[in-house]
Amino acid sequence: MERTLTILKPDCVRKQLIGAVINHIERAGFRVVAMKKIHLTKEAAGEFYAVHRERPFYGELVDFMSSGACVPMILEKENAVADFRTVIGATDPAEAAEGTVRKLYADSKGENIIHGSDSVENAAIEAAFFFSTEEVVRSN
């Protein structure tokens, strides 16, 4: 069984869409094996998104991700990483397929509701950033 990491971003929390988005994710066959609600500091957001440090949007991304509470989750499913990227849709909601999380709920490319790991390797690294092994529930 494969795992991926997602983060319901501050815009999702502010718009009170946590339940709707989790429902969408679970209906797509994913099992939530870890979840918490946190408020990232700028330092933590910068560390998490360090891979984008040289990109022009890095500062705005760090500011946004530290602007309010977010909900990181570890999800489990066969082919989790690729399937989840399909479920959430393109980064820009204007380009996202109908019925995807971003098409349904996101307002812009910068505030796009949700993060999804882009590879199995990054999913493991990102999951370890937010969760200890004790916080991850083994699926039955």
UniProtKB/Swiss-Prot annotation:
Cited function: Major role in the synthesis of nucleoside triphosphates other than ATP. The ATP gamma phosphate is transferred to the NDP beta phosphate via a ping-pong mechanism, using a phosphorylated active-site intermediate.
UniProt record, GO biological process: CTP biosynthetic process; GTP biosynthetic process; UTP biosynthetic process
Name of the featured protein: Nucleoside diphosphate kinase
Subcellular location: Cytoplasm
UniProt-listed InterPro entries: NDK-like_dom, NDK-like_dom_sf, Nucleoside_diP_kinase, Nucleoside_diP_kinase_AS
EC number(s) per entry: 2.7.4.6
Record's keyword terms, sorted: ATP-binding, Cytoplasm, Kinase, Magnesium, Metal-binding, Nucleotide metabolism, Nucleotide-binding, Phosphoprotein, Transferase
